């Protein structure tokens, strides 16, 4: 099926679900940008469109001519995709569409542009699913997004490893089918390959600090934490969506290193939030049970605790951090409260927001300012 045919079919699907005046997703800037933050109806329409594109992409993959599916294997992949790709908040994927709209500076998106920006957004959601399926196995996690981790679902187990590999390969099937005739196709492939490598390297740094028998809090520092976060989270969660939108808009990524730097800083702020929520948020609100303490993670909280601990408090931290027993975890959490790490985080959040806002407002392009502000608005003071 050609790209144009896919777009026509998508258009028919969208017209049934969404009023015609919502088919063109308008770019928003200035006062309209503020209205976008306040308007739930437009976000609902965008999400409906986005989910329609997921159905098209999933159908493509379930009928990929490169593999002769049996009914059983097709049903497995169908279920696996819905469980792992479709079940998140979709913030990364939707951010591609939001960013591209803002870069268009008030011009209506064509039906094909809507489809392609959504398709790129879904490639990032596929990448996220691939990382999380394997990350949950490595961390021996229990829940993800309010339900059992995929590998803990009955009859899945270690088949989840192969499912992760499938998810990774699906990305390039989508890119080839829908973008190979675009002038930025090679740049897209390079971008996804580079970001995947960066994320895998960040995961490696994170994992090798937690070897059994080699746990040493002395090697944890803010610089190590930043390095892990920059590579493991910031590039794929913050830079990748904007980079995809910039490529679709005909931009050269080498001309936007300053944008990358702001997004990396935003990604670090996001991960510090994540570290804080892992310990202090309600698991039901968060959608998962935090295990950073048990897993001996190089968390921002433990790094800040090490900076503030007395000799006696340091001893308590060394004796209890990285142990799975609930009593050990409770002692670490009690210590965090004693050190007022909640207050330390609140101060960090306020200063980070001020710094990021200043960097964004200093950018010469109003369209790029709007893109960066939209990202910051989505994460500032988030609860999950």
Curated annotation (Swiss-Prot):
Binding site for Mg(2+) 2: 135, 139
Keyword Lipid metabolism among UniProt keywords: yes
Pfam families for the chain: polyprenyl_synt
Source organism of this protein record: Arabidopsis thaliana (Mouse-ear cress)
Main function: Catalyzes the sequential condensation of isopentenyl pyrophosphate with the allylic pyrophosphates, dimethylallyl pyrophosphate, and then with the resultant geranylpyrophosphate to the ultimate product farnesyl pyrophosphate.
Residues bound to Mg(2+) 1: 135, 139
UniProt-recorded name of the protein: Farnesyl pyrophosphate synthase 1, mitochondrial
Binding site for isopentenyl diphosphate: 89, 92, 128, 145
Subcellular location: Mitochondrion; Cytoplasm
Catalysis: reaction(s): isopentenyl diphosphate + dimethylallyl diphosphate = (2E)-geranyl diphosphate + diphosphate; isopentenyl diphosphate + (2E)-geranyl diphosphate = (2E,6E)-farnesyl diphosphate + diphosphate
InterPro entries in UniProt: FPS1-like, Isoprenoid_synthase_dom_sf, Polyprenyl_synt, Polyprenyl_synt_CS
Family: Belongs to the FPP/GGPP synthase family.
GO molecular function: (2E,6E)-farnesyl diphosphate synthase activity; dimethylallyltranstransferase activity; metal ion binding
Residues binding dimethylallyl diphosphate, per UniProt: 144, 232-233, 271, 288, 297
CC cofactor note: Binds 2 Mg(2+) ions per subunit.
GO cellular component terms listed in the entry, alphabetical order: cytosol; mitochondrion; plastid
Involved pathway(s): Isoprenoid biosynthesis; farnesyl diphosphate biosynthesis; farnesyl diphosphate from geranyl diphosphate and isopentenyl diphosphate: step 1/1; Isoprenoid biosynthesis; geranyl diphosphate biosynthesis; geranyl diphosphate from dimethylallyl diphosphate and isopentenyl diphosphate: step 1/1
Entry EC number(s): 2.5.1.10, 2.5.1.1
Required cofactor names: Mg(2+)
Cross-referenced Gene3D superfamilies: Farnesyl Diphosphate Synthase (1.10.600.10)
Transmembrane portions of the chain: none
UniProt key word Isomerase: no
Example GO biological process: farnesyl diphosphate biosynthetic process
Tissue specificity annotation: The FPS1L mRNA accumulates preferentially in inflorescences, whereas the FPS1S mRNA is predominantly expressed in roots and inflorescences.
Keywords associated with the record: Cholesterol biosynthesis, Cholesterol metabolism, Cytoplasm, Isoprene biosynthesis, Lipid biosynthesis, Lipid metabolism, Magnesium, Metal-binding, Mitochondrion, Steroid biosynthesis, Steroid metabolism, Sterol biosynthesis, Sterol metabolism, Transferase, Transit peptide
Gene: FPS1
